[in-house]
Amino acid sequence: MKGKHHIIVESARLKYEFDIKRNITIIQGDSATGKTTLIDLLSDYQNGRENSPVHIESDVPCEVFAGAGDRWRAVLELITDSIVFIDEENHFIRQKEFAEVVRNSTNYFVLITREALPVLPYSIHEIYGIRTSGKYHFPEKIYHEFYPIYGDTLRSQ
């Protein structure tokens, strides 16, 4: 899979809109910034596509990887040409074996983590946080966007 993919994940009260440009994208941030909420919305959609209150717009499938224990490699190898979202609770993302799976995969990976992942070859320009705008009372939608952790100051050096 190559190129940029525009993703919109939306429910009645929340909206995430972002672009995935490389095979590894990292989303970082403190607690309560919306990282796990994004995974939860994607999971809700994945588990009940027709009846889900979550709407996803994407030119490629979006999959949430959820617990396969020691079989994580076999499960990931079944997914092809998709954007795979993996939360930090999956500790295998810190292993060299995972880096090998990513390198040989046709998927893009979005990794939600607070820690550095030194075994993975990702670009500093693909490390994002989640910025929230909007009100937290009912009728108004809360809009989430990704922002780069390392900005243009590094590009000009």
Predicted regions and their residues:
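A short helix-turn-beta junction within AAA+ P-loop NTPase domains corresponding to the substrate/partner-engaging
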Residues: 121-147
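Sensor-1/coupling segment of RecA-like P-loop NTPase cores
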Residues: 102-131
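Conserved P-loop NTPase "ATPase switch" module shared by AAA+ and STAND
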Residues: 67-96
